[in-house]
């Protein structure tokens, strides 16, 4: 009898059959850029299912067992039909999505995927220079971005159509090796301006140059011989042809 062993005792015949056995393996894979955001679980649990019903207790996968496990000595068939084995991860890992690939014959792989969190750094540029009174303001400036003290990017910034100076560094990693990255910005030196950085906003200040204008009243009248000299006169200062301030009095 195929697949059976036969033992004859006198006139009695005994046929024996050993049900087939199988094994099922599972491996845990992490797709998270080497745990960049530090969210990876230290351990997960996996449940084996036989024809949709839980088989045994969940098993733990972790670094100690290389995130892999094999169920051995499993029955191949039940009620004359081949058993379909599947696996599922117990619960969820916060911040991850889970996919299961493979089969009982080749082994299952449970992949947890996390896309590292991204951020943008935005800032504004303001000028404190009396509306560029002295014509010193440049047409463009350079802003440099640093990640934990190391330069990561730079950007040339100009005024937009409304005259506003803004910049943005996008698609930046929020974490590195599980620790939040500290981003800072600097500005290349702007001649004659001082720079103050507040967070990601940059303010450049320039003190317009100052000058002075003097006037002296002289009398050419032979020392007021005829007594016509005025006791006081007034003088008006002009800037580019327009009166500047009030007239001032000159007298003895």
Task: Provide a role label for each language-model segment.
Residues 1-252:
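Solvent-exposed loop/turn and edge beta-strand elements of beta-rich ligand-binding domains
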């Amino acid at each position: 009898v195929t697949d059976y062993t036969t033992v004859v005792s006198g006139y009695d015949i005994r046929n024996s059959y050993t049900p087939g056995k199988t094994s099922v393996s599972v491996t845990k894979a992490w797709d998270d850029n080497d745990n960049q955001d530090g969210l990876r679980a230290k351990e997960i649990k996996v449940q084996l299912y036989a024809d949709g019903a839980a088989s045994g207790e969940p098993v733990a996968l972790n670094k100690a067992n290389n995130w892999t496990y094999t169920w051995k000595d499993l029955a191949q068939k039940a009620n004359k039909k081949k058993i379909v084995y599947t696996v599922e991860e117990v619960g969820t890992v916060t911040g991850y999505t889970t996919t299961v690939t493979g089969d009982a014959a080749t082994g299952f792989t449970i992949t947890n995927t996390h896309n590292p969190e991204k951020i943008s750094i935005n800032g504004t540029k303001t000028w404190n220079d009396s509306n560029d009174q002295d014509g010193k303001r440049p047409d463009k400036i350079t802003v440099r971005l640093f990640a934990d003290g190391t330069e990561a990017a730079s950007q040339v910034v100009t005024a937009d159509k409304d005259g506003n100076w803004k910049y943005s560094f996008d698609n930046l990693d929020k974490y590195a090796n599980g620790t939040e990255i500290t981003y800072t910005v600097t500005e290349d030196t702007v001649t004659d301006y001082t720079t103050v950085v507040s967070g990601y906003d940059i303010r450049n200040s320039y003190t317009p140059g100052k000058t002075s204008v003097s006037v002296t009243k002289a009398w050419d009248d032979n020392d007021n011989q005829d007594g016509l000299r005025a006791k006081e006169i007034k003088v008006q200062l002009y800037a580019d042809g327009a009166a500047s301030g009030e007239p001032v009095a000159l007298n003895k």
